[in-house]
Curated annotation (Swiss-Prot):
Primary localization class, coarse: membrane
Protein name from the UniProt record: Phosphonates import ATP-binding protein PhnC
Function of the protein: Part of the ABC transporter complex PhnCDE involved in phosphonates import. Responsible for energy coupling to the transport system.
Encoding gene per record: phnC
Domain of life, per lineage: Bacteria
Residues involved in ATP binding: G40, P41, S42, G43, S44, G45, K46, S47
Amino acid sequence: MTDAALALQAENLRMTFGETKALDDVSLSVKPGEMVALIGPSGSGKSTLLRVAAALQVADAESGPVSVLGKTMQQRGKLSGRVQRNRIQLGFIFQQFNLVGRLSLFQNVLVGALGRLPTWRGVLGIFPDDVKQSAMDALTRVGVESFAARRASNLSGGQQQRGAIARALVQGAQVLFADEPIASLDPVSARKVMETLRELNKDDGLTVVVTLHQVDYAKRFCDRIVALNKGRVVYDGPADGLSRDKLIEIYGPEFETAFEGGDA
């Protein structure tokens, strides 16, 4: 990776499901250290864009290349032969936390180190002391160290989600994709998760791209917002430039009723 490498570069992405164009010639670039929100109505393509960028879904053959930190993830409808290696510095946070419920939070976070350890260590569950320390440091960093020994299934959604963020830190992620990370959380837990992401972005320089349904959170925590509608980018600019009129254009006339009393 060179100093000039973008955290994310996607060119002319297309993704179809039957007759539906989930992504319709979408291009997006994200600089290292940015925190970017992807917003838009349900079905607008924001989650699909994130999954294609992470090479969790394969775009159509007519699509251009996708790279993360200068390393190709896929192009022309084919995954890179080195996609597993290229994902090492990319963390992905899912809406449903993706933790193993029977394992402790600490054990779940240790899993983040598997990509850089010999296979036998993962099979036997034997982790070096420095990895164990990094896992505890990561839990402390996101504010859930006191729950390290508790089974993930016994934690709240917000605690699990912050544990998932800690796992990405142990992985060594420089770029973090978060797909609707607060969609199933109560307001207090949602705020804590977004504050954690913002602190990691500001203090550690972690690049964050997050899909959100909550426009007020996008405007509060992200400097840049990219809005999609029907698979196309309809806004890409600063959060403070996203006016109510533009939001009505993005979401439709129901926006004012649906978001009445909000911060948008």
